[in-house]
């Protein structure tokens, strides 16, 4: 288990949370900005799960970063920097699941559409789930789940059928129940 956070308080909370649950993890020797200094440059993960900051406009970008294999992300929005960072750290059969703002599914500003197209054309996108707004306490914007797979070949050991050239789209925007004026909760029903 490896984690990375730029904020010292978030890093300490993650360490405490992991310790309480009995998990061991490599959080690096200190907090660091993922885009300025990747603490795990050689990490290739089987699974990546993430909830990066949505639409972050205040991020560091180096145009020649090797992680930008599918296109240089725009300076004003880190969404596709995060996506490519996750892909960069996947093992050859690795999978990633993460949440982003819904705009990440349709934005065409500053090359974002080209990056998204490249991800689809290289068959990395396994599933997209559009969710309703008001799921987070920190923002009311609608969000989506991205699921990426480095390999969509059949894998009996993992219980996967051949999914090459297939992408599942799920429209879940109408799901959930408002629990108060500004918060929605997804339920089993």
Residue ranges, per PLM feature:
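Intrinsic structural disorder
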Residues: 1, 14, 22, 95-97
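Short, small-residue-biased leader/transition segments that mark boundaries at the very start
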Residues: 2-7
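A conserved structural/catalytic subdomain of Rossmann-like adenosyl-cofactor enzymes
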Residues: 38, 42-189
């Amino acid at each position: 288990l490896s984690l990375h956070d730029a904020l010292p308080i978030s890093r300490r909370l993650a360490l405490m949370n992991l310790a309480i649950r009995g998990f061991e993890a490599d959080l690096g020797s200190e907090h660091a900005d993922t885009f300025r200094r990747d603490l795990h440059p050689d990490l290739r993960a089987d699974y990546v799960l993430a909830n990066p900051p949505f639409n972050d406009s205040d991020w560091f970008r180096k145009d020649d970063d090797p992680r930008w294999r599918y296109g240089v992300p725009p300076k004003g929005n880190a969404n596709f920097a995060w996506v490519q960072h996750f892909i960069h750290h996947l093992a050859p059969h690795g999978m990633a699941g993460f949440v982003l703002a819904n705009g990440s599914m349709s934005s065409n500003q500053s090359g974002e559409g080209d990056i998204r197209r490249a991800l689809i054309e290289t068959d990395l996108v396994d599933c997209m789930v559009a969710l309703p707004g008001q799921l987070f306490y920190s923002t009311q914007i609608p969000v989506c789940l991205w699921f990426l797979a480095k390999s969509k070949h059949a894998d009996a050991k993992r219980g996967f059928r051949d999914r090459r050239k297939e992408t599942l789209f799920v429209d879940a925007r109408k799901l959930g129940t408002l629990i108060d004026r500004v918060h929605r909760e997804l339920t089993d029903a």
